[in-house]
């Protein structure tokens, strides 16, 4: 083989290995990306037809939180549509009616069974002496 052909072969093999590495890394990271869907997106598409976990985010509707013996149920909205969420576990401290949450779980018929709840907080920090009620 000529030197030119060896260099070309080395370059092609290097790019092929690099490309495969990128594909493997992106495939592994796919499940950890923190995007979420709104209730409108979930209800309008067949997003939940597969058995993969999805994240859904929205505001907890006031008056919708119901505590049962072993789980809690509530409705979230994106100010267009609403969806029922069922959760069994310890709620985050920032969980309250009117606050925004992101829930991770699966759709079962028309209800969302959450495995994890993340409460979103206000990005505007105010020291307690300046807070107004």
Swiss-Prot record:
Function: Heme chaperone required for the biogenesis of c-type cytochromes. Transiently binds heme delivered by CcmC and transfers the heme to apo-cytochromes in a process facilitated by CcmF and CcmH.
Protein name as annotated: Cytochrome c-type biogenesis protein CcmE
Topology in membrane: Single-pass type II membrane protein
UniProt keyword annotation of Cell inner membrane present: yes
A Pfam entry, by short name: CcmE
Gene of this entry: ccmE
Sequence positions that bind heme: 121, 125
A GO molecular-function annotation: heme binding
Keywords, comma-separated and alphabetical: Cell inner membrane, Cell membrane, Cytochrome c-type biogenesis, Heme, Iron, Membrane, Metal-binding, Signal-anchor, Transmembrane, Transmembrane helix
Chain ranges on the Periplasmic side, renumbered to this chain: 29-133
Record HAMAP family: CcmE (MF_01959)
GO biological process: cytochrome complex assembly
Cytoplasmic side: 1-7
Record-linked NCBIfam families: PRK13254.1-1
Family, as annotated: Belongs to the CcmE/CycJ family.
Membrane-crossing residue ranges in chain numbering: 8-28
Cellular component annotations (GO), alphabetically ordered: plasma membrane
InterPro entries to which the protein is assigned, alphabetical: CcmE, CcmE-like_sf, NA-bd_OB-fold
Compartments in which it is found: Cell inner membrane
């Amino acid at each position: 083989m000529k030197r030119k052909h060896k260099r070309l072969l080395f370059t092609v093999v290097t790019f092929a290995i690099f490309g495969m590495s990128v594909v493997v890394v992106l495939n592994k990271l796919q499940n950890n990306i923190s995007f979420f869907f709104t209730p409108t997106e979930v209800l309008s598409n067949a997003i939940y037809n597969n058995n993969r976990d999805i994240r859904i985010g929205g505001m907890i509707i006031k008056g919708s939180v119901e505590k049962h013996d072993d789980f809690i149920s509530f409705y979230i909205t994106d100010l267009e549509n609403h969806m029922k969420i069922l959760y069994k576990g310890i709620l985050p401290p920032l969980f309250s009616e009117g606050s925004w949450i992101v829930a991770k779980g699966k759709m079962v018929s028309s209800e969302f069974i959450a495995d994890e709840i993340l409460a979103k907080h206000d990005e505007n920090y105010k020291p307690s002496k300046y807070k107004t009620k």
